């Protein structure tokens, strides 16, 4: 992908929407983590927060954005729309998705560490250890699915190669 300025913390609570046209972003907050990087890393990070109606109960219970509501895009629809609008492409979206999940797991771990060591007392953080494990499992599932797909593709190529080999 190409390099650009990435925000590094895209979430609904970091954008200001136009009250007269709530689908129009008129401001972006929280730029302290901005840097130069791959725009698909930003997308992967943003979608790690994206909870869909089909996600497991842990993600639904800890959801902090309205991404599950009727009419909202699925993660895949967001990716497809983003790639279409930007003209970018990727042969390995799973890499970016897993990166975003790993990044979110690290953030959750940092928050839980502070809660566990009584550096913060917000009760919302007491069960973050569960979220960390759920994110880990979600990342492993995505990696596993990608390996299965890669293996199936490899098997097709091997079969095709065998057809082309002299007997």
Model-derived features: positions:
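Active-site acidic catalytic loop and adjacent metal/ATP-binding pocket
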Residues: 1-41, 45-47
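Active-site activation/catalytic loop segments of kinase-like enzymes and analogous catalytic loops
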Residues: 41-86, 100-118
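Conserved NTP-binding catalytic cores of kinases and kinase-like/nucleotidyltransferase enzymes
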Residues: 4, 16-26, 87-90, 147-167
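Regulatory N- and C-terminal appendages and interdomain linkers associated
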Residues: 106, 110, 114-167
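Pocket-edge positions in alpha/beta enzyme catalytic cores
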Residues: 35, 67-70, 124-127
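All-alpha amphipathic helical-bundle segments outside canonical DNA-binding/catalytic cores
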Residues: 89-100
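Conserved acidic
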Residues: 2, 74, 92
